[in-house]
Swiss-Prot record:
GO terms for cellular component: cytoplasm; extracellular space. PANTHER family: FIBROBLAST GROWTH FACTOR. Pfam families: FGF. Coiled coil: none annotated. It comes from Canis lupus familiaris. InterPro entries: Fibroblast_GF_fam, IL1/FGF. Keywords: Developmental protein, Differentiation, Glycoprotein, Growth factor, Mitogen, Secreted. One of its GO terms (biological process) is outflow tract septum morphogenesis. The keyword Cytoplasm does not apply. The keyword Lipoprotein does not apply. This is Fibroblast growth factor 8. GO terms for molecular function: growth factor activity; type 1 fibroblast growth factor receptor binding; type 2 fibroblast growth factor receptor binding.
Length: 82
């Protein structure tokens, strides 16, 4: 497992993400295009990266908010968001 560092630097090649659908509906997995690692959540609510994204800790449910933004709620730890 690797730590995730989000520095918000424009043009950073590690900022490109690939969103994969998990099932019919609004469940997705997110992985880094450069690394191939999946964004997951640990039991403390911290974002971590894993090479295998098959666990529920790596699945997120898309929730559309009133302001038209999309929130990603972790499938394993409901109430925790990315």
């Amino acid at each position: 497992n690797k730590r995730i560092n989000a520095m918000a630097e424009d043009g950073d090649p590690f900022a490109k993400l690939i969103v994969e659908t998990d099932t019919f509906g609004s469940r997705v997995r997110v992985r880094g295009a450069e690394t191939g690692l999946y964004i997951c959540m640990n039991k403390k609510g911290k974002l971590i990266a894993k090479s295998n994204g098959k666990g529920k800790d790596c699945v997120f449910t898309e929730i559309e908010l009133e302001n038209n933004y999309t929130a990603l709620q972790n499938a394993k730890y409901e109430g925790w968001y990315m």
